[in-house]
Amino acid sequence: MTIKDIAKLADVSVSTVSRVLNDRPDVSEDSRRRVRAVIEAHRYVPNNSARDLVKIRSDAVGLVVRGVQNPFYTDIIHAIEQKLDTSGYTMVMRQIPSGDDEIQCGAVMEKEKRLRGIIFLGGRSDYSPEEVSLLGVPYVCCSYTNSYGTLPPESYSSVSIADMETAYQATRYLLDNGHRRIAALITCPDDHSISQLRYEGYTKALAEAGIPLDESLVICTGTFNIQDSYTAMNRVLDSGADFSAVFAISDNTAIGAMRALREHGRTVPDGCSVIAIDGIEVSDYIDPPLTTLCQPMEEMGRRSIQILLDMIEGRSGNCHEVLPTVLRPGGSVKTLV
C-alpha cells in the first residue's frame, strides 16, 4: 500500500496523508481520524520501518539546548518539564555545544524519536527557509528570535526579550550614573546572535549620549563562559585600557569579568562598575551582588511550551511573544559625581 492508496481510501489528498503521518497540527480531526483508520486497518508501515508501527501517534516533544552548562537555562528547562508532566507528553532533551547546528540536531531527533514538536533553547538568529525546511513539526525559538534571518514571521514561533532595548537600558543606566568610559563584554559584534543585538543596544545608547564608540573597549569573549570572559577581561586590563564601567551581555560573562577586575586591584564597584543581563540566581549571591536586568526565565519556559502544545493540538498557529525584563539593583554600580 502507498500513500496514494491511503488518500484514496480515506477520501483525502496525498498531502493530508503526509501531514497526518508527520503528526502535523494543520489537519482537521475528521480527516486525521479517517486516515488513521485506513492506516490501522491495512497495517500500513510508514518509511518501510517496523519501528514506526509501534506508535501512530507520538507523545514526545524535543528540547535542543545550545550551549552546554549554561545556568541561564536551568529555570527555563524546569518550567518546560513541569508543563509537559501535567500535559501527558514526554520530553527528549539534547544538549549541544554553542558551535553546533541546532536545526540539524532537531531534524535528526524528530525522525529518531517521532517528535510532535521541538523547542530550541538558544540558537542563531539568522535562519533561512531552506535551513528549517528540514523540520516537519512545529517549533519554538526560546530566548531568541530570527532577527537577522529571512524566515517570514508567520512561519515560526518565538519567546524572547527585547534584547537590543534591554542592552540599551543597561548602558543607559551606567550613563545615568555618570559613566562615560563604558566597556562592552560581548561574544562577537557581528555573529548574528543575541550578542550582536545587545551590542547594538550598547552602541545606540552611547550614540544618543554623544559618546564616540571606542573599539578598544569592545571586549570579545567568543562564548558566554565564565572562563572565557575572565580571560578576555584580563587581556584588556593588561593592555591598560581606561574605563570606569562594564556592560556585560550576560551574568555569566559579568562574573568572569568581576574576578579579573578584582585580581587587577579594581574592586567592584569602587574601582569599576558592572551591569549585565539575565538574573541567574547565583549572581545575587556573589560579592557584591550583581546589578542586572532580569529575564523572566520560568515564564519564558512556560510560554514556549504552551505555544508549542497549542500548535501541536491545533488550537493556534505561530506567534511571537516579547517578555519584559526587570532591573535588579545589586551592589555593582557606583554613581560618579
State what each model feature region is:
Residues L121, C142-Y144, I161, L185, ...:
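Generic beta-sheet signal
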Residues A232-V337:
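Flexible loop/turn connectors
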Residues I56-R172, D176, D238, D242:
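Alpha-helical recognition/docking segments in bacterial nutrient-uptake
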Residues R114-L121, A183-I186, I219, G240-S250, ...:
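Periplasmic-binding protein-like
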Residues M1-S58, F72, V337:
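N-terminal helix-turn-helix DNA-binding module of bacterial transcription factors
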